[in-house]
C-alpha cells in the first residue's frame, strides 16, 4: 500500500490530489505513524529505557538470525548475553561499512522483515545495499513532520520541493503524498517563467524544502530574473527546510539574512540509524531523536566519531555503526546530548603541501572571501596534494578571480576556473569537494 502510494503520488492531477492530500497520515502510513508520532513526544526517561531494551533485543536477534553478526561478534570476542546499562554499550564492537561489504546482503539481513532494498554511499565510493524495515516510512515521516512542525508546518500545507528528481521536461509537477510541487532543478528559469509565475501566484505555497544548494540557486535565479515574483514568493513563505546536504554558510546566509526566511536543518543518513534536528533553527547544533535510534560520540584521537544504532531496523541491523562523520559533541549525564558536524562522511578536506589535511569548511567558508559577493557557487577540486582548483559559478565575466580570494598562509598552489553552472551529482546536489 505504502509503495503503491509512492508510485502513483506524482501521477494524480492537482485537484484530485489536493483532496487526497487531506487524508490523515495515520491512514496513509498506518498505525505505526501514530505510534512514532507519540514517541517523538514521550518522556526522556521512557525513551532512554526503550533504547536500552531495543538494543538488547537487536543484539540477540542479530546474533541468531544473521551470519554477519554471528561472525562479527565472535571475531571481536563479544559474548555478553545482555547489557544492563548504557555504560555497557561501548563493549559492543563498532561496525564499519567495510565490515558489511565483506558479506552479501542476505548474510547481513532478515529478508522476511524487509519493506524494500535501499542503498547508500554513491558519492563516497563505498556503496552499500541494505533493507529498510516495514515501519521505515512511518518512522521517517513521523519524525520529519515533528521537525518541520517546529516552524509551524502541517501536513496539509503546500510546499515547493527542489532536489534532483528527474521530472522530464516539465518545470514542476504535483505530488499529493507530500502535498508538494516538485521543481525541475535542471530547467532554466528564464525559459519557464510563465509556469513558475502560475505556480507561485495561483497556489498557496507556504514552505520550501530541498537541498540547500538547490534552494539557494532557485531563489537567487528567481530574484535576478523576476524581482517582483521573487518578492511575492518570499511574502508567502513561512520557512525553509534544508535537508540532505550540509547547509553551507553562503547558502544559509542568503536564505535567512537576505531573504529574511526562517530555516531549519537536520542531520540524517540513508541507513536511518540516527536523525537529529536543530532545536534552535539556524544554530547548526543537532539533537538526536531518542525515538528514532541511539547515537553515540566515540573518541577517535583528538576528535569524536558519530556512531549510531538503528533501534527499529531488524531487517538489516545496524549496531554501533560508524557513520563516518566527525563531530563536536556535548554530553549530558555521560551520554551524547547534541553535536555539531566537524567533518562530514564525504571527507570535505584537502591535503596541503606539507601533507596536512585541511578542512574545506574553514578554507572556503571561514575566510570571508570577497568572491562570494560575485558568485553563485564555489566548488573545489584537488588534482594532486598541495594543489587545488577553485571552480567559480558566476554570471560576471572576470579575467582574474585570485584577487577575490584570500588563501594567505595556506600551503596550496591555487588555480581558478569559471563555470556557467555548477557541477552537480546525478541527484542534483552541488557538492563543495569534487572527486
Feature map (PLM): residue ranges:
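Conserved beta-strand termini and adjacent loop/short-helix elements that scaffold enzyme active sites
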Residues: 162, 266-268, 298, 383, ...
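Conserved AMP-binding/adenylate-forming
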Residues: 238, 242, 247-333, 346-347
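Conserved beta-strand segments of alpha/beta enzyme cores
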Residues: 179, 262, 379, 413-415
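AMP-binding/adenylate-forming catalytic core of the ANL superfamily
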Residues: 208, 314-412
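Conserved adenylate-forming
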Residues: 165-285
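Nucleotide 5′-phosphate-binding alpha/beta core
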Residues: 1-119, 126-141, 145-157, 165, ...
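Residue-level signal for inorganic ion chemistry
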Residues: 62, 120, 159, 208, ...
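Conserved beta-strand elements of the Class I
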Residues: 158-160, 307
Amino acid at each position: 500500500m505504502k509503495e503503491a502510494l509512492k508510485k502513483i503520488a506524482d501521477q494524480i492531477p492537482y485537484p484530485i490530489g489536493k483532496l487526497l492530500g487531506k487524508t490523515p497520515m495515520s491512514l496513509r502510513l498506518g498505525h505505526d505513524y501514530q505510534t512514532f508520532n507519540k514517541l517523538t513526544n514521550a518522556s526522556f526517561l521512557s525513551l532512554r529505557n526503550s533504547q536500552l531494551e531495543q538494543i538488547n533485543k537487536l543484539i540477540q536477534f542479530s546474533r541468531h538470525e544473521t551470519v554477519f553478526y554471528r561472525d562479527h561478534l565472535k571475531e571481536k570476542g563479544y559474548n555478553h548475553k545482555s547489557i544492563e546499562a548504557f555504560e555497557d554499550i561501548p563493549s559492543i564492537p563498532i561496525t564499519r561499512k567495510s565490515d558489511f561489504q565483506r558479506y552479501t546482503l542476505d548474510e547481513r539481513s532478515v529478508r522476511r522483515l524487509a519493506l524494500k532494498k535501499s542503498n547508500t554511499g554513491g558519492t563516497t565510493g563505498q556503496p552499500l545495499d541494505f533493507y529498510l524495515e516495514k515501519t521505515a516510512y512511518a518512522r521517517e515521516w513521523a519524525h520529519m513532520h515533528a521537525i518541520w512542525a517546529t516552524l509551524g508546518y502541517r501536513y496539509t500545507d503546500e510546499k515547493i520541493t527542489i532536489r534532483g528528481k528527474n521530472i522530464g521536461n516539465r518545470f514542476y509537477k504535483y505530488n499529493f503524498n507530500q502535498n508538494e510541487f516538485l521543481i525541475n532543478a535542471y530547467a532554466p528559469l528564464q525559459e519557464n517563467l510563465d509556469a513558475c509565475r502560475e505556480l507561485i501566484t495561483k497556489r498557496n505555497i507556504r514552505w520550501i524544502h530541498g537541498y540547500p544548494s538547490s534552494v539557494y540557486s532557485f531563489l537567487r535565479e528567481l530574484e535576478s530574473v523576476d524581482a517582483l515574483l521573487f518578492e511575492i514568493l518570499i511574502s508567502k513563505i513561512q520557512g525553509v527546510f534544508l535537508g540532505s546536504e550540509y547547509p553551507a554558510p553562503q547558502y544559509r546566509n542568503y536564505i535567512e539574512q537576505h531573504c529574511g526566511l526562517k530555516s531549519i536543518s537536520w542531520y540524517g543518513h540513508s541507513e536511518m540509524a540516527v536523525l537529529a534536528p536543530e532545536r534552535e533553527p539556524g544554530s547548526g547544533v543537532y539533537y538526536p531523536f531518542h525515538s528514532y535510534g541511539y547515537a553515540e560520540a566515540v573518541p577517535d584521537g583528538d576528535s569524536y566519531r558519530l556512531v549510531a544504532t538503528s533501534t527499529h531496523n531488524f531487517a538489516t541491523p545496524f549496531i554501533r555503526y560508524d557513520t563516518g562523520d566527525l563531530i563536536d559533541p556535548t554530553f549530558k549525564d555521560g551520554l551524547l546530548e547534541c553535536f555539531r558536524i566537524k567533518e562530514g562522511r564525504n571527507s570535505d578536506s584537502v591535503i596541503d603541501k606539507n601533507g596536512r589535511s585541511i578542512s574545506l569548511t574553514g578554507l572556503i567558508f571561514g575566510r570571508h572571501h570577497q568572491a562570494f559577493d560575485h558568485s553563485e557557487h564555489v566548488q573545489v577540486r584537488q588534482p594532486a596534494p598541495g594543489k587545488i582548483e577553485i571552480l567559480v559559478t558566476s554570471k560576471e565575466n572576470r579575467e582574474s578571480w585570485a584577487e577575490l580570494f584570500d588563501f594567505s598562509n595556506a600551503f596550496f598552489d591555487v588555480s581558478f576556473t569559471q563555470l556557467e553552472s555548477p557541477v552537480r551529482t546525478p541527484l542534483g546536489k552541488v557538492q563543495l569537494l569534487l572527486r
